[in-house]
Amino acid sequence: MAVSGSFIVPNHSFLSQLKSPQPYYSSNKQLSLRVRGSLCSSDDGEGKFISKEKDEWKIKYSSEKPITPLLDTVNYPVHMKNLSTQDLEQLAAELRADVVHTVSKTGGHLSASLGVVELTVALHHVFNTPDDKIIWDVGHQTYPHKILTGRRSQMHTIRKTSGLAGFPKRDESVYDAFGAGHSSTSISAGLGMAVARDLLGKKNSVVSVIGDGAMTAGMAYEAMNNAGYLDANLIVVLNDNKQVSLPTATLDGPATPVGALSGALTKLQASTKFRKLREAAKTITKQIGGPAHEVAAKVDEYARGMISASGSTLFEELGLYYIGPVDGHNVGDLVTIFEKVKSMPAPGPVLIHIVTEKGKGYPPAEVAPDKMHGVVKFDPTTGKQFKSKSSTLSYTQYFAESLIKEAEEDDKIVAIHAAMGGGTGLNYFQKKFPDRCFDVGIAEQHAVTFAAGLAAEGLKPFCAIYSSFLQRGYDQVAHDVDLQKLPVRFALDRAGMVGADGPTHCGAFDITYMACLPNMVVMAPSDEAELMHMVATATAIDDRPSCFRFPRGNGIGAKLPANNKGTILEIGKGRILMEGSRVAILGYGSIVQQCVEAASILKKQDISVTVADARFCKPLDTDLIRRLANEHEILITAEEGSIGGFGSHVSHFLSLSGLLDGSLKLRAMVLPDRYIDHGSPQDQTETAGLSSRHISATVLSLLGKPKEALQFM
């Protein structure tokens, strides 16, 4: 081992500790890893990765694996318990370097993880996980947590098929106390665990870590209100990084959380009164002296009596004891605060407000935390991402371009998103029409009813929300929109399987939960040109609500309409793509492309296939379905959605019309009745049994050709 140009020969006992980390060891031994505050890869000092300069750790990023001698001794949180503050600071530096190196090779969520490195180290140092529970809101920030809880050797598999999940997952590790992926759930879950702990007579701590972006959702306040009423012992860590931890960039840069809370937190951090009182507290406690008073000084420094009323009143009125703001990158301060709060016998609910920087410690992420939020593989030295080139745009961009074209001709069109301007493509719309685009924060319930109010007054709202996120506002869709027949247009992005983000973001259920509503028009495009037509169609529907779903990923290269301006479709009418005789495959949405491929496969088996694009799930094209049923031996419906969706509606019509009373063989191909784990889109399609090969095999099996069918399974 070479450190800062000098060789260190560790004793045998220490060498064995490096190979087989022990739960408890002397922090003095770890100091032998430091020579002139540097960690190097060669004895001449070249290749230095991590160094300490003026009490601050500096990291030199490169494509080489960083030297992390202290992190190498920490497999689980128990290995951190005897570390000094100086050791913890070094551990944080090595952990940050390791996160950047790992994500540069795998892709994933980077900026959020870098922003909580010191917080993660402090939490696992103070609290006795997994007995003590740490609940991470959303979960984008949990890579450091995974590394410190026995999963470092598996980090190269993160978000890959059969690898680690990109979010906390209960069945992955006992250290993942609660699964996540959606926002603003941590306080509710933590409160439930705290109450369960008390009822069961246990004594463990419960910590909920939530970002300021997630605090824009009403659920967080519902939970805090209940926590104050129950007076349960719960620790809430508010990670204030002035960023919504989602791809929320505008074209001018990252977006900050919207609403009054963001302003209140900013005022609190900048409060002159707070700063003066904090300095006064430091002076007084220094005069008293002594270790006990040093601890008291840290807590009193951040106690609620020393903050401005503009920031703390809300939390205190809800019944939470407020501590903060605390520097979220100061490990020593974090440890002191956590230890003091943990030692309190019955503190009730406590909110610790920490201030962090998203992307901290990695320059490319610090200057562009939005662009480095979710990344593909990248060059650690420059931060340049290795994005694959495509001849087509994403479906999201086609949607945005089409909506802009419609809005240029219709000034009643407005757009709404829930803190997802970048993810939904509405950042482009906002650039063009800043007064007609509304970011409501991570508040899908409010987004839907806000859109309903706009529609009630004659505007034409497009509410763009990921399919899985609209689940959070479903009562509003049913009660506030559909029941009143208000013409809100729902653009459901990320419909179907979404690859590496896994089941929390999978848009499996929207066909089912939207098509069961009596007044809703439900559409799905088979390609990017059809998407543009459906944007135009939704614009024209002004007597009832409508929705259209589209997948993650890029278009297939379909010929686009002139000037990217769609044509209004006839409501409830599909189209025939290929004419055949024996078998009919009726696809709904993007899976139509697999249906066409299956027809080509079957043609080689001398099987004549008709392929139809349904376009609409509600209202159904009953004339088309009747024709397909009458003219073919077999009718297969295919969709990338759950049980109860398009296939169920087709089956219901066929049964009521008596078309199932004859010899027709009907099969509905849908997602299996389980959650599909993260992986590549291709792997997920195979796992779900919805590839062109699976469609072909289903046809062959129904035609009494099991041997031929097995060739495609």
UniProtKB/Swiss-Prot annotation:
Q: Which InterPro entries match?
A: Dxylulose-5-P_synthase (IPR005477), THDP-binding (IPR029061), Transketo_C/PFOR_II (IPR009014), Transketolase-like_Pyr-bd (IPR005475), Transketolase_BS (IPR020826), Transketolase_C (IPR033248), Transketolase_CS (IPR049557)
NCBIfam families cross-referenced by the UniProt entry: dxs, PRK05444.2-2
Reactions performed catalytically: D-glyceraldehyde 3-phosphate + pyruvate + H(+) = 1-deoxy-D-xylulose 5-phosphate + CO2
Matches recorded under PANTHER family? 1-D-DEOXYXYLULOSE 5-PHOSPHATE SYNTHASE-RELATED, 1-DEOXY-D-XYLULOSE-5-PHOSPHATE SYNTHASE 2, CHLOROPLASTIC-RELATED
Entry's SMART domains?
A: Transket_pyr (SM00861)
**The protein, known as:** 1-deoxy-D-xylulose-5-phosphate synthase 2, chloroplastic
Native source organism of the sequence: Cannabis sativa (Hemp)
Per the entry, what this protein does is: Catalyzes the acyloin condensation reaction between C atoms 2 and 3 of pyruvate and glyceraldehyde 3-phosphate to yield 1-deoxy-D-xylulose-5-phosphate (DXP).
